[in-house]
């Protein structure tokens, strides 16, 4: 459980010091491998994978400490905008996810052709849906903004959020970067497109 391992936000990466499901499976003789994003502290830690193929972990083992769930929240030194680019295109994260998906398909084909019938686990991690909100056009075209409703529970419409959510929004909130509802809808469409992309 997250309260036992202390990894409940993007600030604290899992380091394997408390055994997880992967270690337990390895201990029983199972083959356990990963392809793609894990977002753990380091590939060098005993996180429960016999092999990590093209892993993505926390940069230098440190997460977004400023966004940690703590009292009080840290102040950001400058406005932090995650929506610098929204719309059709191909980001480096999209390329990474495609590479991970292709590697997983090849891994599964090789496994199917193997005579080894021992149990195995393959975990495949993707970055999407994640900022930047950029998706290949064939996926973005699936979500015309005129068909997307605006969020129902929005403070600009009088909705009262939980105080904790208000505090978090004051630290890393992004909605105030949008000048128009059309921009909000473009962001929602791009997010949905990234979900379909995955």
Predicted regions and their residues:
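Formylglycine-dependent sulfatase
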Residues: 1-198
């Amino acid at each position: 459980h997250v309260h036992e391992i202390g990894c409940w936000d993007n600030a604290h990466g899992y380091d394997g010091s408390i055994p997880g499901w992967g270690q337990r499976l390895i201990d029983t003789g199972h083959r356990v491998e990963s392809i793609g994003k894990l977002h753990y502290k380091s590939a060098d830690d005993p996180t429960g994978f016999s092999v990590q193929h093209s892993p993505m972990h926390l940069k230098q083992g440190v997460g977004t400490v400023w966004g940690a769930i703590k009292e009080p929240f840290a102040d950001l030194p400058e406005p932090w905008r995650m929506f610098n680019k929204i719309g059709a295109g191909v980001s480096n994260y999209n390329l990474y996810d495609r590479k991970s998906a292709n590697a997983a398909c090849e891994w599964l084909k090789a496994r199917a052709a193997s005579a080894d019938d021992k149990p195995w686990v393959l975990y495949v991690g993707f970055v999407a849906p994640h900022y930047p909100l950029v998706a290949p056009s064939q996926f973005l075209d699936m979500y015309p903004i005129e068909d997307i409703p605006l969020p129902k529970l929005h403070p600009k419409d009088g909705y009262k959020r939980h105080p904790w959510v208000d505090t978090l929004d004051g630290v890393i909130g992004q909605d105030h970067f949008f000048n128009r509802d059309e921009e909000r809808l473009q962001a929602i469409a791009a997010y949905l497109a990234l979900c379909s992309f995955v």
